[in-house]
Amino acid sequence: MWKQSNPRINKFVQVYSNNNHVKNCLNRASSKRYLNYIHRVFYKYKLPPELAHLPILESCFDTKADSGHARGMWQFTRSTAEDYGLSVGFFSDDRLNWRKATHSAARYLKKLGERFNRNWELALAGYNGGPSYMERQMKSQGTRNFWKLKLRKETHEYVPKFLAMLKVARNKFPEMYFQGAPRSWASSS
């Protein structure tokens, strides 16, 4: 289901292997037991368990992360948050409630998976760049192969970064990587 290796992924495997970013994010997730909860929610929505690690890339599991246009562990923009049931107002912002936001992330990822025919590379690119952007690019370039699409830099690098991060986390920190994962998944990897 997931591409395991290519030059774009390997480039980021080198980056993530030579710094402590993945370890620090997994430590934060482990100490707060975020992954246990996220895995349960994603299992309920029948999502690939690897997607539970998306917050490493989005926010390093920082529930208060703020990039200026997106907030929370899942880095939702205001419009996406509201589309998926989160309240965003002056006095309260559900994007910062990681439990509520996790359910919204699961619904959004499920919808992206359906929209892109369970091609999770395209779905992840849609999570980053927006599903309409991805559909325009696929139509104009005549391909549904993520690896052949020419995309803006952030989206072009998003999926290889995610897959590299998964590889480093699984191989270097398995005890944290598999925390809360379904047994069938942990035993088959």
Regions found by a protein language model. Give the residues of each.
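An acidic, Gly/Ser/Thr/Pro-rich helix-cap/linker signature
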Residues: 1-46, 174-181
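Solvent-exposed loop/turn segments at secondary-structure junctions
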Residues: 59-62, 80-81, 130-133, 169
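Solvent-exposed, acidic/flexible segments
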Residues: 24-35, 44-47, 66-74, 94-102, ...
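Short, solvent-exposed loop/turn and secondary-structure capping segments
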Residues: 64-69, 136-139
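Substrate-binding/active-site groove segments that recognize
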Residues: 69-90, 102-109
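C-terminal amphipathic alpha-helical segment
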Residues: 160-189
